[in-house]
């Protein structure tokens, strides 16, 4: 019993004393250096015919390789930045912010919440199988959002569900 008490006291002493060596090795966080800006996509006609994100393939390829993000997703993020820039010039939403949301929500598309059934972005940039979140029915941990799309996007006519790689709810 005495040994257990001695060990407990030693651990307690170390916990309140901290580790002075690690305190001395800490470097201050620079406050004068902003993070490097992401490479903006080249200007394209986002109102042009066809799938305009395909025009960003050359821009997206090295970014996809460097980041490990699916090229389809990089092109979609870049296209969304250009659309937002045109629609709301003062918005300043950049593709890498969208990529951050995409990573958190679905790891840029493959995470579906099902361990053995990951999604893939097809040639059209659509996740297959579809990524559909849990019903927003007000149960513990979830907001209650009654259906807004008649089940068109989320196959649920009673409640909304977050859909797609970015996990937007249908009303957004």
Question: What function would you assign to each model-found segment?
Answer:
Residues 13-85:
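N-terminal export signals and maturation junctions of secreted/periplasmic proteins
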Residues 1-15:
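Hydrophobic membrane-insertion alpha-helices, especially the h-region
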Residues 8, 16-21, 110-111:
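Short active-site-adjacent helix-start/loop capping segments
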Residues 53-60, 64-172:
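Catalytic glycan-binding domains that act on GlcNAc-containing polysaccharides
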């Amino acid at each position: 019993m005495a040994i257990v008490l001695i060990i407990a006291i030693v651990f307690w002493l170390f916990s309140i004393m901290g580790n002075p060596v690690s305190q001395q090795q800490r470097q201050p966080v620079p406050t004068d250096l902003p993070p490097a800006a992401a490479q903006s996509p080249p200007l394209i006609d986002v109102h042009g015919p066809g799938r305009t994100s395909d025009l960003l393939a050359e821009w997206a390829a090295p970014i996809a390789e460097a980041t490990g993000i699916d090229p389809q997703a990089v092109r979609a993020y870049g296209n969304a930045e250009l659309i937002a820039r045109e629609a709301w010039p003062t918005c300043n939403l950049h593709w890498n912010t969208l990529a951050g949301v995409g990573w958190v929500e679905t790891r840029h598309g493959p995470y579906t919440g099902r361990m053995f059934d990951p999604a893939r972005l097809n040639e059209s940039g659509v996740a297959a199988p579809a990524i559909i979140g849990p019903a927003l029915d007000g149960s513990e941990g979830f907001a209650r959002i009654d259906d807004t799309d008649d089940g068109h996007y989320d196959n649920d006519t009673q409640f909304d569900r977050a859909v797609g790689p970015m996990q937007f709810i249908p009303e957004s």
